[in-house]
Amino acid sequence: MSGAMRRIGEYLGLLEDTGRYDDEYGDYAGDYETQETAPVATRSSKRESRPAPVSDLSERRRPASGPTGVVAELSRITTLHPSTYNEARTVGENFRDGTPVIMNLSEMDDADAKRLVDFAAGLVFATRGTIERITNKVFLLSPPNVSVAAEDKQRIAEGGFFNQS
């Protein structure tokens, strides 16, 4: 039998071990000293199991930026016409700065437009803002501290609201 097959047979216990061990390592039985183990003291202190006080979750859900009751006066709206998904960063940066953003996705293919709407929806959800569909492939993203009046939304829908920055 070849060496590899013999070793496999020895490993599986089908053949006797040939005893190919070096004699220089010898028997280690005499080299070890036994140590007595000391018993470990167990803690017998009784802890009272009290439930933790319940906190109101609505206090933790407040937005991190600014007071919620203050509504900023609308001074400008940024209109973007992205052509690829790579322009999502521009949408996010303008929205993060507190500027309402109009996304006109009519120049994008449907797959990238869907990705950008998903990005915008996540952005708006994370910051507690709002997203509104103005017309087909045109969306208004409003930060949480900004209120866009109904007549402004109507002007946006009619196409009369351009970038005022």
From Swiss-Prot:
InterPro entries to which the protein is assigned, alphabetical: Cell_div_SepF (IPR023052), Cell_div_SepF/SepF-rel (IPR007561), SepF-like_sf (IPR038594)
Annotated compartments:
Cytoplasm
* Region listing for Disordered, in residue ranges: 23-75
Give the main localization category: cytoplasm
Database matches in Pfam families:
SepF (PF04472)
Arranged from A to Z, the UniProt key words for this protein are: Cell cycle, Cell division, Cytoplasm, Septation
Query: What are the disulfide bonds?
Result: none
GO process terms (BP): division septum assembly; FtsZ-dependent cytokinesis
Xref: HAMAP family: SepF
Spell out the PANTHER family in the cross-references: CELL DIVISION PROTEIN SEPF
Free-text function comment from the UniProt entry? Cell division protein that is part of the divisome complex and is recruited early to the Z-ring. Probably stimulates Z-ring formation, perhaps through the cross-linking of FtsZ protofilaments. Its function overlaps with FtsA.
Q: How does it assemble?
A: Homodimer. Interacts with FtsZ.
Q: State the protein's name.
A: Cell division protein SepF
What is the species of this protein? Nocardioides sp. (strain ATCC BAA-499 / JS614)
The gene that this protein is the product of is sepF
